[in-house]
Amino acid sequence: MAIISLAEMMESGVHFGHQTRRWNPRMAPYIYTARNGVHIIDLVKTAQCVETAYRWVRTNAEQGKRFLFVGTKRQAAGIIAEEATRCGSYYINQRWLGGMLTNWATIKGRVDRLKELERMGETGALALRPKKEAAVLRRELERLQKYLGGIKNMRRLPDAVVIIDQKREYNAVQECQKLGIPIVAMLDTNCDPDVVDVPIPGNDDAIRSVKLIVSKLADAIYEARHGAAPVAEEYDYDGAEDEYEDDADEA
């Protein structure tokens, strides 16, 4: 049985790329044509890449490898948290802090601080502090939960990283390259496939497209650890917007 079908990719808008003037020529092998000034991604190539990525991820998950999902754009943030949690992986979905991987010792210190503050809240120790001090500590806790909540149980560097929008998450890509951590990445037509290990060409700006691809990768991890994956819950699209142009230039 195919991992992904052309019909579900069409329905999710996986084939829509960026405006032709904003393309990266290295994505040419994955582009089918251009229509009305917009590149159309070759979904046959995408299906092949999804199949390859699924097998690669599942094989590594079966070997006990741990995955970190990264996607900080609005369209991806909720999906990243939901799918990474579903398959028991780590995630970063707010802001990539410099040195998140290359300076892991320091980041781990902040993660330990997050756990300490959470314990204080759970035991009631936080409420016993003077009002002003407690307020400061709660703000610190909220900030740490926002940026590090998805990796608070990560004891060491991940074995592989799944990235949505290689161009936007450039800093994460660079850190993975420095450390030799394999990258699985969803790439729009403005991205560079040469800087990742397992490319998946597809629309990384449309919510349904991101959901479809990320859920397949999460399925691979879940199935490797638990057997057949449950049907992924329908993502709540209210309040989230598809954006085809704005976010890609922020990296």
UniProtKB/Swiss-Prot annotation:
This is Small ribosomal subunit protein uS2. It comes from Synechococcus sp. (strain ATCC 27144 / PCC 6301 / SAUG 1402/1) (Anacystis nidulans). GO terms for biological process: translation. GO terms for molecular function: structural constituent of ribosome. Signal peptide: none annotated. The lineage of its organism: Bacteria, Bacillati, Cyanobacteriota, Cyanophyceae, Synechococcales. The keyword Nucleotidyltransferase does not apply. It comes from the Bacteria. PROSITE patterns: RIBOSOMAL_S2_1, RIBOSOMAL_S2_2. The keyword Hydrolase does not apply. Belongs to the universal ribosomal protein uS2 family. CDD domains: RPS2. Keywords: Ribonucleoprotein, Ribosomal protein. Pfam families: Ribosomal_S2. GO terms for cellular component: cytosolic small ribosomal subunit.
